[in-house]
């Protein structure tokens, strides 16, 4: 409430502005000016009283003259002071004078100094409502005193100088006692001399100040009222100039003395209060925030007489927290109008209201120590505006404009014709009015405030006073139209209903309705009259007649023995009889409900054992009433109100949990309880005991699904019996809450299922016919749907059995079509609860919010909205359980069919409720990690108290913390970085070269698996300045890699800790969903982290997003992105992961614009082999001791021993790909004889060490492109239309996402070259890798073609020649020193490419092999025939699922595969006919043939012979220098259309094809070009005017 006074904050206003605009209280000059001042010392002594016990500073010593002389020589001279000086002023003014002389005084002959006499105002310093605040924010009072020019007074003969400066002025104004005796006298006049006698100045030659109040005028106001006094004083105030030159000392007790007195008494009795004149002087700083208004003197009263030295202060009126019952009494007890008392002075026009308003200061300036007590604001009633409620209603209704009746108003038929009773309730089937007596209970709480609450009286539990009609409105299904309605409310809400059956709608009503509908025309429809524009004219009224017939059913009582059919439609009479199954809560559910009852009664403080009638009433309190109590208890923000709020919330949670358990099982109740306990600590503490009991029972349900709810056992029996009779299709109708339990049951039974979980894009209802056309429904055994997804056109004829679980519904809710000739077997399961039992009472009055808005958790406009949202949580299936899959397309609305032998591992629901997770890297990666600093790591561990799970992982990624799947944090310390840089760089010219290493190596490796990188640099200012200078290099590198970079600089360890903790908290807030991560690393996580784009958090997301890893691998790429995107997994990481899984990894993963983007691998002397999936030091138990493998052993397999855990069951789960075996030099040096028998190696006798995917770019392949093995290439040919990737092969993973070749280094072409059987073979000998660089510039190749057999040289990742044939021993090879490299923080994953010197030094190692490589080549190089797809599929399935390989049995299969055709390119190369194509294609094929013949010539030479080309290191160096790291963009540059360029290109092609020297450097694999760097044009043929065609860029 705002008063009419101004609210001005004087302390926040600038001092200059206040000084210019504000004035002070102007007091008038006295009418009788004082007479000349005459000093009278006697009066001063009498005035202040004598001080008897004051001793002189040094007393006269009664000793001899000698001693006196001695003392006079030693002791300083004394100054004689008259004792009367102390009687005059006890405030130590510092000015002393004497009018007498002492005989022994040292200054007896000196003249008395001249004293300046001034006078102070008689009244205290008065102010208006304006204060001036100086720059020091001190409070100052100003009063103008005449300036007196006086020079400093110097005592004669002494060095003492009396200054007349600011100190004197402050002491003058610090007079603390100014009497006014006229208050104690009876007359109203004061003598003139009396005033001057009582207020004698202490100095001479002083003029009376202008700031003075006429005492006579003030005393004459004693006979006036308070209001007249105030305005009289205000009228006499005149403007007065102010002087802000002095800083005053304010008496605190004088300014705030009013706090000790009741202002109401002062104003009512017109008196002053007694106040002691003695006060302490304090500095003004302590009262800079005072709310000083003004000082007024009011005449005395007989009750309080005396002198007062304190002012009366005013403050703005405020509304106080008073007893609310008094407020109610004021408004409720006004029975008659009371004439207000009018004060005519208040409305006088002569009154200056503006000045009076300015006297009142805003309440915002009140003292913090409650020095001023706010006055209660009186309630002023405007009796002229007060009117009765009837008058208000009358005015409102009178303003309503009447609307004219429509022409069809008289045509309406009275609806009471349909009823024989006087009152009809069918129009409002869901409305009821219940009257309850509610009492107010007032309880005192903290701070003298009153808290009220509703107390349910005995009448509240009585039967509702109105009759509830359960008859639905004709032709409308109440449950379909009103989903949020409590379906159990009609059965359980009223425990006192009478048993027995009664007819709600008799047969006569149905007959009348039938006749009425037949007699009505199309225009008699109600919708036509309500809205003719939207009305639909029905040509056939039979549907309405049938709808009226369906309402002829009985409404039974809640007796459990009687079947109820209320609230829905039953099967058509033409169909078979409905089979009713009644179930009751099982013993384990009843035991848990008993625990719930104990906790419930404990909360309401009723702990007796027997369930009396009163306790039943307590248990049956409805959910709506409890929510009202929660809202009302939360009105007052006190501790008592909070306790009551959570008490009511616990009661409601127990009732809701019991309802879920009784109708949907323990599993659903556990999910709900888990959500509630995670919402807040009070709820978790209150439900801790119940949570333990439910969790224990829930764990036991995992072994036996039917223990969750007895209805599951009934459904299991129905399905087993129906399927045993040959019925293969079942339709399950249930609420979505029950879907999770149904799916668990079906998986345990080995049945596949689908669910219609999303609507069709063409309408509100799902179009099941579209699903049938797509072939989904016939695949699965069961279809799960909800009531909202059923339409009258639902094809129930496709199912042999229909099972509807009613849950809280007592009767079926679906009406089947009447036109069906054969109706399927229909089973309805109903749950029966005994109302006198605890289950029935706790479930009474509970509703479930099926509204979509409530499910999503929209904000409720109440203070307890979040609590209501948690209590209304519906445990729907939000995550995919094992055996189920989400939709792959938005237009599809059913999931993929489930296989019967899948694992039953269940992902716990509610990922959004689990704690957030951060990963700490415990492995040292070329720098000091955060975990090595104990103080920082302890603070990170302390985050677990705030709900953050801290997990340790030994990761090869050069990060300290992984805050989320997309965010990582790195910490660099100047000391460790400097030491490392000095040790590795040596005499490097740049001391910050490690910055460049971070930009090129670290950020590149992190860009695969993270989208945001946070770097914290800690060190001295010089180190930080150097980092900032080089920051542009880091930002440029991050921008080119597409990763967001944030850099922080810290000068101390504490600041570093603060930055890290802030980053963790920020990441937790941004990540809404988190996965629950185990403390130890699982085998699946260890496998996934070998991918360069998968970090531990991303791996956990992949494992948690579906039931199994195999299921995730089978998903399309779009579904993978959708599942991981909600956990903030970068889409690029998922793309790279999918590409690596499908095509394998590329070696040239760096940007093609850098010099390091070469396809050449580093040799064996390199510290890091170029692997696409590196496991680091994880799982050391998998490392084998053997480093070389004999080729005779490669084709022999034995059962797996060490990798048994990596392979799942024969149901088709994941098997470890042998492509990883050739990539990791630390882990996968294995002997296939003992380690990888289950891996899908090639058949015996056919080894394909060089099989790999051509590219990780999906655009390079046809849709049906697949593994690169020659044994499977024919399966992916385009001439096999009846076999595709999309076909699900039982027992094997999706071929679209998986490959099974033996893989070379990062990427190489697909080849089917056989491997010679050698005595010693090293899979990881890369010494000859650099010999395969070739001139591939300017050529265009069809990316859809695949290269088979011996088309191209083998991959640089493998050495085709034995180590004994090498010219140089491995020990003699030059090794690269670690000190010669730059500081590398990521040496295990980032490929290192050899330089020209390395290539030169290893060029002489090339040698050929004499052994015959192409034995049995005829069988592999034969013809292509159209092998039947069915046979292909059988053979492939046999190979991939075989547990062991026997050479004798696989030879026929090898021969059969040899007849499969090759790719178009392979066939063109082997063809003897000239290819009719463009010149560049012919030239390209000729070059391929030349290379093939050259290789054959080389292989025919003995092992000790040199290559035919006899190349020298110099030649190799020249070739490599010329063509080192060509940019892929050069391939796409437009060279122009002139003949010169064309001649050069043809000449180069001719030379390259004819020269055997160049062919050794040829590599058919192009470097992978990023999407953003690809050419914007494409090559195409165009015809010129002469009819010739040529290739041009478009």
Curated annotation (Swiss-Prot):
The role this protein plays is: Essential for the formation of class I meiotic crossovers.
Q: What is this protein called?
A: Protein SHORTAGE IN CHIASMATA 1
Assigned keywords, A-Z: DNA recombination, Meiosis, Nucleus
Which coarse location class applies to the principal site listed for this UniProt protein? nucleus
Organism lineage reads as: Eukaryota, Viridiplantae, Streptophyta, Embryophyta, Tracheophyta
UniProt lists compositionally biased (Polar residues) regions at 1577-1594
Q: Where is this region: Disordered?
A: 1148-1180, 1239-1283, 1396-1426, 1491-1523, 1536-1594
Describe the outcome of a gene knockout. Answer: Reduction in the number of class I crossovers (COs) during meiosis. Impaired fertility due to altered male and female meiosis.
The protein's location, in the record's own words, is: Nucleus
Q: Name the protein family.
A: Belongs to the XPF family.
Q: Name one GO biological process term.
A: resolution of meiotic recombination intermediates
Q: Which organism is it from?
A: Arabidopsis thaliana (Mouse-ear cress)
State the superkingdom: Eukaryota
